[in-house]
Every structure is written in structure tokens, then in C-alpha cells.
């Protein structure tokens, strides 16, 4: 291999060479490829395409020309970077779903919202749109600078006159080296109104500009959620705008619904969006969708139909789709454009200021051009006027001249004419010597003088020039302006909360002794008569049992108060929904409990900010405290201190009050004290309370509740052996806080110690939970009303080693009650046939007849009997559901 001459080798440091070469490449990409000019909103490739269309005369009133011809001409003259990049840029300018105001009028297949590519350039045709003419108007009147093309054989515009603000009207996107731009499209009417306001008030604020320019206006319409993202983008040049599809929920007969999507967010691929929905349905991440189809057509426009199952909540499904699919997405605004050839981040006002300055420059240069042309013409007309005034001498001079050159010199010398004037006289036809032509020349001359005066006035007075810019912008607005397509919805839509995705329904949250938690729909538990065996509420682990239960809405807050005096918070829907037989999940997976900490009370609250509500605390040692509910509105995931007390004490219960209640505190030895809540001074969140009741030896607090001063409520007492009774609240006199209380029940071996003391109205249902995990739901009104000293009546039949662990009130809901005969039950015999057994009456219990369901079986123990009944009830429910589905079909 021959060695290169030494003179052709330049030694350079590789670091310097890489730095300089990369910078040259980066600047080339930034300036000459990826970023739009702030003045006309175009990248070089788009500018060259439009100029090429103009040079080829492909105006809207001319016929379409092959795209291949356009691309070839642009590539050969101005853009030597490959035909595909030119054609792709032209295709995008022709897509009405990509450009708010398309700049190319395409004929043929130019792609679709489903991501389909355009047909090959040999098949499609194109020409300019009408609005494109406004980008190029006056380009031949010295309004902009021209530069050499890549090989120096052609001239191309450095920028277009851009008689409307194209940068913001159609937006722009591009990725350069180390930077990127993403500018949303806007409504032309609003933009021009904004420019007009800016021209009248240069000190206008962004907020004032937003009175004219509401926000982006996307070609695919859709919705924008809130204005905070828009305002941030307009003020800083950067921001995120939440876009959402337009969807409606329609009825489709038979109680069924469908979701119909008619507009989708800008730049969303419709086909991929539908695929994403189908994928979520297939993976069971979204439930309740039975059918999904695309009914989009030229006649109907975008129409995506999502059929919803009859028992599903269409609104919740739609919110899930918003959160998990491109039905809702964001547009990241990054307004970077070339300003004086340099990339710069600009805000809304800066973009309009630069555009307005460009228009003033265009109009000024056009005026100067027109003035030059007018003066040149006036100069010629002055020569013609001289010739007409001396026509005989002019003719004589010309006839005496041997050549054109001699004639021109003679005319210049004899009549003091310029070369152009002399040439115009020589070029003048004889017919212009008539009197009529003389009048025309005189009229044209006078008209030109007036025109020159107007042009000079424009150039001399900046305000006159600015008014001319306003008038021309107004004319464009009136011709091409339209109504905005994208609707801006005001409100707290920027962040879709989890709560929006969850249907609001009544639920039951259970907590086991070993701290396993779950939630179930409240309808899981059917109302039964007293003495029933109940249904299996959960399958507990060995030595575990349900200890607490609370009813609330999925959207309510749940406050968890622990024996250590701490408080934690969850939303109802944040507790996992599991099956009735499931044991639940460890509560430490939901809230961050400390060591040796267990939940003592769960309270459902709708509004934690309420200033009218209080929380009353009671500890095992008889200490009480009252604190404002608002003190607990902000609780971290790791909890906060709710009450302070001695090491040998622990929190027993907490109640929500209105501030005007009577406080009831009950003990395991059946003592109860009642005193006004007003005697408790509100204390801070971490404060220690005061003495609420004086306890006897071996006694401890087991219950805390509230009642109104003249309440007709009753005190419900339930003992550990399943007995209970109701006693009017007014049977318990008011006393001073800190007393020993009065007797509320007679405690014997038969009924056991008190496990629950609470107030009832008689209109609730009662849920009684045993240590075996059995739950029974019964009507409080069915419980006998007895005096304070009574033992109570049997509420639930307990097996050996069973006891009542907790009791909870449930709002009565007729829809949850079954229509089955509660006085009989069915069992399954060995041959599979159902046998009907009569209920027996428990004569041990006084009062009204108590219907008790008893299943005798030699092969099953008590747990087995419960399982047999549960299996049968599950199959009955399945049969009922199947019959209902068949009827619907």
C-alpha cells in the first residue's frame, strides 16, 4: 500500500478532534434538522417541501401532482438527505390527525390513526392547502433572506414569511442532540387574538394572554384535565398536560351499558390502545368487559365500543381504563425553538413576541420593496409625461438618430431624462400617444404618488405599521379561524385518585385475634333469627378467631387504634377483599405495626377534617380522654401517637362523638357509668387522659359508647357465653366522672362476664363473632328488653370451648335479607337427597319464641354441621344465580 504524502497528514489530539467533530455534528442536527424556527415554526425539511411546492406552482387551485415528483425535486434542489425523510415529513403535514391545520393537501392513502403507513410515494399525490399560501405569501417581495442551497446552485429561504403563527398553531416535535422539543398545537382564532392583545399591550402577562389562549387545541379533540399543567407550561416553557378521551356511557337495553369512545388523545395509536384494553381484560386486570370493537368509519368518525357486563359498574370500568390505558395520557410540553439561530426554551409570551417581531419585519420589508417598485414606476411615468408634453420633439429626435444608443443618449441630453426613462420612451407604442392613453398615464402617476405617500407613512410610523399587521392577522383569522376542538375541563382532574376506580359500597372489615385482616361486602351475611347457627365468616388458623368487625363504605377512612395508644389510617378499599372463608392477610402487610402492638379499635370516618367531631378514648384502667377528630386528619403510614398512658395500661376502645353526648363506660364485672361528655376537656393528640371510672379489684373496662341526653336508645349487653339483653339508656342515671358506676347485668356461670356494652336503637342488625370464627347476623329488635339486673337471653348457641369474641352493629339493609324460611333447614343425606328438618324451640330462654336451627348428625361434629349447612347454602345461591342468568338470557 502506497504511503500518503506527508503534507496530507495532520496530527491532532483525539480528544480535541472528537470534541470538535461532535459539536459540529450536534449543532448541525440542532440548527439544520431537529428544531423549528420560532418565526415560522418549521424545520428545514418542512420549509423546503413547502417552498418546493410553491416553486412548482402546486397551489390549491391547480391539479394534484405525484408525491414522487415533489420529493425528487426537493431532494435534488434543497434537501439531500434521502427520499424517505422528505416523504415522511410531507405525509405528516397532510394528516389531519397530526396537524391542527394541515399544510399539504394529500390525495390517496396518507396513513391513519391506527398507525398504518402511507402508500408509496409513487401512488399518492399532493398540493398545497389554502392556509399554506399564507405561510408563503409575499415571499417574492424581499420579505425574508434567501441563502445558498447545499451545492450553491440554488437559492432557498432561510425562513418563510409565515403570515399566521404556525409554531403554536400546528406545534412541533423533534429530538436533537442533548435536547428535544415538544410543542402542542393550538387554535388559530385564539392564537391570533393573543397576538393582537400582545400588540396592544406589550406588558401583558401570561395570565392575561390565557384569557385569549385557553390552552392547546389538538386535532383529535378530546379533553384536557385542568389548567394547572397548561399554566405551568405557558409560564416556564415546560409542563405536563393531562389529556383524556371523550367517552360516554350508553344504555343498550336489558339493564346493560356500553362505553363509547368518540375522541382519543393526541398522538395516541388507536389500534394499540384497543390492544392494550384487550390485554388488560385477558389478564383479568380489568373485570366486567364483555365485548370490545372498533366501529370507526368516515361517516361516524372515531367510535370504539366497550360492552359492559350487566352487574358491572361502567363508571368504575371507565376510570380503570383511564388509569391503565392510553385513554388518558399526558403531553409533555418542552417549548424549545431556534431564536436567532440558537436553541432556546421559550414561554408562551416569548413565542408570540418573536412571531410579532417577525411579522413587523416582514411587513416593513414588504413595504420597503413596494415603495422601491412604486418609485421606480413613478420615475418611468414622469419620463412618459415629459415625452407626451414634447411629443413632436421626441419623435424628431428619434428620427434623426442613426441607432437606438444614439437616440437614447440624445433623449437623455435634450430632455434631462434618465437611462430608464429614455428606454421607456423608446419602448412606448405609438397608440399610447392618443389622448386617452395620456389620461391613463396621468391617473396612474397621481395614484402612485398617493400610494408612495401611504408607504412612507407606514415606514415612518411604527404604530401605523403595527396596525397593518393587526389588520392582516384579523383577515387571516376571519378566513381560517374555527372553533376549538379540545374541551378543557376544570376541576381536580390532574391526578386520578384510586378512589375514582373503586365503586362505593358498604363493606365489612374483620380483624382476627392474630391480626389477620380482610374486607367483604356487607351483603355476604344474611339476616337470621336469634339462636341461629350463623354462617362461616372465615376459616381461622388454629387458636385464632375473629376479634373485631366494623362496617363502612369503601371510600371511608378506617382509623386503627392499637393497645399501645397509636393510630393508623387506611381507606376502606385499601383493605384487600377476600372470600368469606379466607383468613385474610397479616395486618402488618397493610399498616406498619410496631412490635407487640395489636389493634384495639377500628373506627370508620367519612370526613377527618370535621371540626364538629371528637374522639373519646377509654383505657383498661378506666382512663378517658377527649380529642378533636381534626387532630387525626394527617396520619403517616407508620402511624402516630393517639394517647399516652402508663406502662401497665392499654387502650380498650375509641368512639366518635359530636361533642354533646353522654359517655357510657362498662366493665367486665357489669358495672356501667354514665356522665356528660362536656365534663371532658378536649386534649391534644398525645395527651394523657383523666379518670373515667373507678374499678374494683379484678375488674377492667370492656366497653365504651355514647348516648344522647334524652336518648330513647338502649344499652345492649352481651356476655361471653352468648347471652344478651337490651335496657333503656335512661335506666342509667347521670353521675360524676370517676365514680364506680351502677350494675348493668347479673353475672353468673351461665352467662359469663360481659364482653360488649354498646348502645342500640333497635333498628340495627347485630353481628356476633365467636372465637371459632362463626358469625351470626340478627335483628337487634328480636333481642328481649330486660332490666338492668337481668342476665339476658340466649343470642347464639355455642359449642364446647366456644365464646363470644366480639360484637358489632350493622345498619339494617332489607336487600341483604333472604326470603328463605328461617324456621327450617336442609341437610344432605348420604345418597345425595335433600332432607327437610323441623326447627326446635329452645325452652331454656324466656320471652318470645326463639327459632333455632339444629342439624343432628352422627357423622358430623358441630364444625361439620356448620360446613354441611354452608356447602348447601353455597349451592343454593349458585342455583339461584344460574336461574337468574337464564332468565336474563
From Swiss-Prot:
The record places the motif (GyrA-box) at: 528-534
Mark out the compositionally biased spans (Acidic residues).
Answer: 813-823, 876-889
Question: What keywords is this UniProt entry annotated with?
Answer: Antibiotic resistance, ATP-binding, Cytoplasm, DNA-binding, Isomerase, Nucleotide-binding, Topoisomerase
Coiled-coil stretches noted in the UniProt entry, renumbered to this chain = none
* Gene Ontology CC: chromosome; cytoplasm; DNA topoisomerase type II (double strand cut, ATP-hydrolyzing) complex
Question: Can you say where in the cell this protein is located?
Answer: Cytoplasm
Instruction: Tell me the first and last residues of the signal peptide.
Output: none
- EC number in record: 5.6.2.2
Q: Which domain of life is it from?
A: Bacteria
One short Pfam name that applies is DNA_gyraseA_C
Where is the region Disordered?
A: 810-889
What SMART domains does this protein's entry cite? TOP4c (SM00434)
Q: Where is the composition biased (Basic and acidic residues)?
A: 863-875
Which reaction is this enzyme known to catalyze? ATP-dependent breakage, passage and rejoining of double-stranded DNA
Question: Into which family does the record put it?
Answer: Belongs to the type II topoisomerase GyrA/ParC subunit family.
Please give the NCBIfam families that the UniProt record associates with this protein: gyrA (TIGR01063), PRK05560.1 (NF004043), PRK05561.1 (NF004044)
Oligomeric and partner information:
Heterotetramer, composed of two GyrA and two GyrB chains. In the heterotetramer, GyrA contains the active site tyrosine that forms a transient covalent intermediate with DNA, while GyrB binds cofactors and catalyzes ATP hydrolysis.
User: What does this protein's UniProt record list under function?
Assistant: A type II topoisomerase that negatively supercoils closed circular double-stranded (ds) DNA in an ATP-dependent manner to modulate DNA topology and maintain chromosomes in an underwound state. Negative supercoiling favors strand separation, and DNA replication, transcription, recombination and repair, all of which involve strand separation. Also able to catalyze the interconversion of other topological isomers of dsDNA rings, including catenanes and knotted rings. Type II topoisomerases break and join 2 DNA strands simultaneously in an ATP-dependent manner.
UniProt-listed PANTHER family: DNA GYRASE SUBUNIT A, CHLOROPLASTIC_MITOCHONDRIAL, DNA GYRASE/TOPOISOMERASE SUBUNIT A
| Name of protein | DNA gyrase subunit A
Question: From which organism does this entry originate?
Answer: Staphylococcus aureus (strain N315)
Q: What is the lineage of its organism?
A: Bacteria, Bacillati, Bacillota, Bacilli, Bacillales
Amino acid at each position: 500500500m502506497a504511503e500518503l504524502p506527508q503534507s496530507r497528514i495532520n496530527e491532532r489530539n483525539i480528544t480535541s478532534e472528537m470534541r470538535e467533530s461532535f459539536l459540529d455534528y450536534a449543532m448541525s442536527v440542532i440548527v439544520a434538522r431537529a428544531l423549528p424556527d420560532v418565526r415560522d415554526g418549521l424545520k428545514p425539511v418542512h420549509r423546503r417541501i413547502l417552498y418546493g411546492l410553491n416553486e412548482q406552482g402546486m397551489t390549491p387551485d391547480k391539479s394534484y401532482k405525484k408525491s414522487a415528483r415533489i420529493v425528487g425535486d426537493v431532494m435534488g434542489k434543497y434537501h439531500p438527505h434521502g427520499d424517505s425523510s422528505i416523504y415522511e415529513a410531507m405525509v405528516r403535514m397532510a394528516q389531519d390527525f397530526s396537524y391542527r391545520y394541515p399544510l399539504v393537501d394529500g390525495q390517496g392513502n396518507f396513513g391513519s390513526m391506527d398507525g398504518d403507513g402511507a402508500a408509496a410515494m409513487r401512488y399518492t399525490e399532493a398540493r398545497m392547502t389554502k392556509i399554506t399560501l399564507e405561510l408563503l405569501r409575499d415571499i417574492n417581495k424581499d420579505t425574508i433572506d434567501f441563502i445558498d442551497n447545499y451545492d450553491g446552485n440554488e437559492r432557498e429561504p432561510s425562513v418563510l414569511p409565515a403570515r399566521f403563527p404556525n409554531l403554536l398553531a400546528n406545534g412541533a416535535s423533534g429530538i436533537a442532540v442533548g435536547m428535544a422539543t415538544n410543542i402542542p398545537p393550538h387554535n388559530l382564532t385564539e392564537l391570533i387574538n393573543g397576538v393582537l392583545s400582545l400588540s396592544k399591550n406589550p406588558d401583558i402577562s401570561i395570565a392575561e394572554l390565557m384569557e385569549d389562549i385557553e390552552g392547546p387545541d389538538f386535532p383529535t379533540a378530546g379533553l384536557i384535565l385542568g389548567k394547572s399543567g397548561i399554566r405551568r407550561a405557558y409560564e416556564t416553557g415546560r409542563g405536563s398536560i393531562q389529556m383524556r378521551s371523550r367517552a360516554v356511557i350508553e344504555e343498550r337495553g336489558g339493564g346493560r351499558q356500553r362505553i363509547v369512545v368518540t375522541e382519543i388523545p393526541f398522538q395516541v395509536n388507536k389500534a394499540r390502545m384497543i390492544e392494550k384494553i384487550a390485554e388488560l381484560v385477558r389478564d383479568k386486570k380489568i373485570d366486567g368487559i364483555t365485548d370490545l370493537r372498533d366501529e370507526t368509519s368516515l361517516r361516524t368518525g372515531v367510535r370504539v365500543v366497550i360492552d359492559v357486563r350487566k352487574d358491572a359498574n361502567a363508571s368504575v370500568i371507565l376510570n380503570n381504563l383511564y388509569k391503565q390505558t392510553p385513554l388518558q395520557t399526558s403531553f409533555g410540553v418542552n417549548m424549545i425553538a431556534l431564536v436567532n439561530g440558537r436553541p432556546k426554551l421559550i414561554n408562551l409570551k416569548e413565542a408570540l413576541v418573536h412571531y410579532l417581531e417577525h411579522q413587523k419585519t416582514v411587513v416593513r420589508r414588504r413595504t420597503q420593496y413596494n415603495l422601491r417598485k412604486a418609485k421606480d414606476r413613478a420615475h418611468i411615468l414622469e419620463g412618459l409625461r415629459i415625452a407626451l408634453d414634447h411629443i413632436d420633439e421626441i419623435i424628431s429626435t428619434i428620427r434623426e438618430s442613426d441607432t437606438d444608443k444614439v437616440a437614447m443618449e440624445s433623449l437623455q441630453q435634450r430632455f434631462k431624462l434618465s437611462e430608464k426613462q429614455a428606454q421607456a420612451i423608446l419602448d412606448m407604442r405609438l397608440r399610447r400617444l392618443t389622448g386617452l392613453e395620456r389620461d391613463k398615464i396621468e391617473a396612474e402617476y397621481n395614484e402612485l404618488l398617493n400610494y408612495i405617500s401611504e408607504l412612507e407613512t407606514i415606514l415612518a410610523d411604527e404604530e401605523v405599521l403595527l396596525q397593518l399587521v393587526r389588520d392582516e392577522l384579523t383577515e387571516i383569522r376571519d378566513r381560517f379561524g374555527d372553533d376549538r376542538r379540545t374541551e378543557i375541563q376544570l376541576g381536580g382532574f390532574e391526578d386520578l385518585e384510586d378512589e375514582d376506580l373503586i365503586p362505593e359500597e358498604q363493606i365489612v372489615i374483620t380483624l382476627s385475634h392474630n391480626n389477620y385482616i380482610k374486607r367483604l361486602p356487607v351483603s355476604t351475611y344474611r339476616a337470621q333469627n336469634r339462636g341461629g347457627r350463623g354462617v362461616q365468616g372465615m376459616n381461622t388458623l388454629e387458636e385464632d378467631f375473629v376479634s373485631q368487625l366494623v362496617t363502612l363504605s369503601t371510600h371511608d377512612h378506617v382509623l386503627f387504634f392499637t393497645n399501645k395508644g397509636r393510630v393508623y389510617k387506611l381507606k376502606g378499599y385499601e383493605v384487600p377483599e377476600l372470600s368469606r372463608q379466607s383468613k385474610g392477610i397479616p395486618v402488618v402487610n397493610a399498616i406498619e405495626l410496631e412490635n407487640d402492638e395489636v389493634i384495639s379499635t377500628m373506627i370508620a370516618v367519612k370526613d377527618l377534617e370535621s371540626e364538629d367531631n371528637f374522639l373519646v378514648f377509654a383505657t383498661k384502667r378506666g382512663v378517658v380522654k377527649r380529642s378533636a377528630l381534626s387532630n387525626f386528619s394527617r396520619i403517616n403510614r407508620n402511624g402516630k401517637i393517639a394517647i399516652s398512658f402508663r406502662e401497665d395500661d392499654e387502650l380498650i376502645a375509641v368512639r366518635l362523638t359530636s361533642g354533646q353526648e353522654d359517655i357510657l363506660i362498662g366493665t367486665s364485672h357489669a358495672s356501667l357509668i354514665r356522665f356528660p361528655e362536656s365534663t371532658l376537656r378536649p386534649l391534644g393528640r398525645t395527651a394523657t387522659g383523666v379518670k373515667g371510672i373507678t374499678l374494683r379489684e379484678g375488674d377492667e373496662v370492656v366497653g365504651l359508647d355514647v348516648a344522647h341526653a334524652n336518648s330513647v336508645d338502649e344499652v345492649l349487653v352481651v356476655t361471653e357465653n352468648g347471652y344478651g339483653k337490651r335496657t333503656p339508656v335512661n335506666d342509667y342515671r347521670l353521675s360524676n366522672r370517676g365514680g364506680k358506676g351502677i350494675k348493668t347485668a347479673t353475672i353468673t356461670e351461665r352467662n359469663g362476664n360481659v364482653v360488649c356494652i354498646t348502645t342500640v336503637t333497635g333498628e340495627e342488625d347485630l353481628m356476633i363473632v365467636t372465637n371459632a370464627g362463626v358469625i351470626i347476623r340478627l335483628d337487634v329488635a328480636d333481642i328481649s328488653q330486660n332490666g338492668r339486673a337481668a342476665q339476658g337471653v340466649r343470642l347464639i348457641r355455642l359449642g364446647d370451648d366456644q365464646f363470644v369474641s366480639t360484637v358489632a352493629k350493622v345498619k339494617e339493609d332489607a336487600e341483604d335479607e333472604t326470603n328463605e324460611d328461617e324456621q327450617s333447614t336442609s341437610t344432605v343425606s348420604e345418597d345425595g337427597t335433600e332432607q327437610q328438618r323441623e326447627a326446635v324451640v329452645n325452652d331454656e330462654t324466656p320471652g318470645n319464641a326463639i327459632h333455632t336451627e339444629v342439624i343432628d348428625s352422627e357423622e358430623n361434629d358441630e364444625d361439620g354441621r356448620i360446613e354441611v349447612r354452608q356447602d348447601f347454602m353455597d349451592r343454593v345461591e349458585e342455583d339461584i344465580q344460574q336461574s337468574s342468568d337464564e332468565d336474563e338470557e
